[in-house]
Regions:
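Extracellular/periplasmic carbohydrate-active domains that bind, remodel
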Residues: 1-4, 40-42, 53, 66, ...
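The right-handed parallel beta-helix/beta-solenoid scaffold, focusing on the short coil/turn
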Residues: 32-34, 43-45, 51-53, 63-65, ...
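Residues that form or flank phosphate/diphosphate-binding pockets in enzymes
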Residues: 64, 102, 121, 159
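Feature marks extracellular polysaccharide-active and adherence modules
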Residues: 37-39, 58-60, 67-68, 77-79, ...
Length: 235
């Protein structure tokens, strides 16, 4: 990260002390940078940062890491528990390893990158931004996704894109089953360009043309008595 980096050893310190250090460091300058050592899978690290900060976390983190953040660049050298980068507004959050359930849940902007696999309900209720998973993603990935882009380099579980409203899901591997009102669509030139840029940012070596595009069938937008069976399945 360069000179002027502030380092904090988490061993023996409370979560409140760690997050207070991050908040104070972020206030020092627009180019503030910090390193956390020995996080030991602690929950709720780097939550609620709304001032620009470049943060490197050396080790695994627990639940809700980097949630409710804005204008941050958080990089975790390890795995993350569930709720990674929940409700991210802007910036970038990445983990080199895998993430638990609901990675990127309700995110509104920015980029979330999971180098390994992601658990169930990855990208649930996304409202914007880009979520990239290098490996596999669990069941109900993209559930109730409203906006944004979700890219999976591996396979996905059942009910992919269930009750998808808007947004786009791209899957390179096998899709176990699509969810209610999720359909496969043809890739366009714009999709290829989008995928190429997102894959490059995530350092993923994959051909954009190898991905399948999943979008909303838009049959759940409005209730129609003629389609009550579709609604029964969705609910």
């Amino acid at each position: 990260m360069g000179e002027g980096i502030k380092t904090f050893d988490c061993e023996g310190r409370t979560t409140r002390e760690i997050n207070a250090f991050l908040q104070e460091t972020a206030r020092l300058s627009p180019d503030a940078a910090a390193v956390l050592l020995h996080p030991d899978s602690r929950h709720n690290l780097a939550v609620g940062l709304t001032t620009p900060l470049r943060l490197h976390v050396e080790g695994h983190v627990g639940y809700y890491c980097a949630g409710l953040c804005e204008d941050v660049d958080v990089r975790v050298a390890g795995d993350a528990g569930w709720g990674l980068a929940e409700n991210l507004m802007s910036g970038r959050v990445s983990v080199t390893g895998s993430a638990g359930s609901a990675a990127g849940a309700t995110m509104r902007g920015g980029t979330v990158i999971v180098g390994g696999n992601a658990g169930a309900r990855c990208g649930v209720a996304m409202k914007g931004g880009t979520l990239v998973v290098g490996g596999d993603a669990g069941y109900m990935t993209g559930f109730m996704m409203q906006k944004g882009v979700l890219i999976v380099g591996g396979d996905t579980g059942e009910a992919l894109g269930d009750s998808l409203y808007e947004g786009r899901i791209y899957v390179r591997g096998r899709i176990e089953a699509l969810g209610s009102d999720a359909i496969q669509a043809d890739l366009t030139d714009a999709d290829i360009l989008l995928l190429a840029a997102a894959l490059a940012e995530a350092n993923m070596e994959a051909a954009p043309a190898d991905f399948k595009k999943i979008v909303s069938g838009k049959k759940l937008y409005n209730f129609d008595t003629k389609e009550k069976e579709i609604w029964k399945n969705a609910l």
